[in-house]
Amino acid sequence: MKDKYSLSRAENIFVAKKLFYEAIHCGAKLGDTNITLPETMTILNGVNVPNVTIDDIQTILNMRDAWRYVLKSVDDTFDLNYICSLNSYVSRNESIEWGVLRKGNVGIGGTNFKPKIPVESEIKNGIDDILTQDISVTDKAIKLFLFIARSQMFWDGNKRTSLLSANKILISQGKGVLVIPEKILNDFHIRLTDFYESNDYTKIDSFLYENCIHGIDYEQVEEQVENEEIDI
């Protein structure tokens, strides 16, 4: 699959900031929170929301901080250490440990797939294999997203960490933003479960490419990119 977008750094950062609330809400939903987009926006604006649990608020704030980190570290080297740094934001105060590879077994709800305990050298090789393939940046980002999610490298926050990792790759190369719209989350989870059990990327990669990679229309947004500031 070819890249859908070819954006300047300023344009891609602009897209990421425009989708900031949606991106955080997407991550929170991947973390199995029971929270709406308006509630997410209210929390991010510093206002308490009745009936939202402390755990869900923690998830939202962790995703906010993780996204801020991505946008400030776009030019940093992407490797396992960077992925661990993302997880240290994502899973802060939510897990046994955060920012380090898990040392015990975990299960994944809704599937019979049992990920093995991660071996650092194997994880590094898996990442390198994807990043050195002769494929588009978008294809690399999608494959990386799926590889990290399926590997279950951490005690918690694996899908959120994989989402942020993919976006680091996309934004650094001006190839858009990966955000899964809430209306297709159920379909996404069905396909992701199939991928977990089969390790067949074709179960889901085209779905993500067609529905979840977002960019800008040059003609409509050229002037706006230069003039608009978005506070995150």
Question: How would you describe each model-predicted region?
Answer:
Residues M1-I232:
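FIC/Doc superfamily catalytic core
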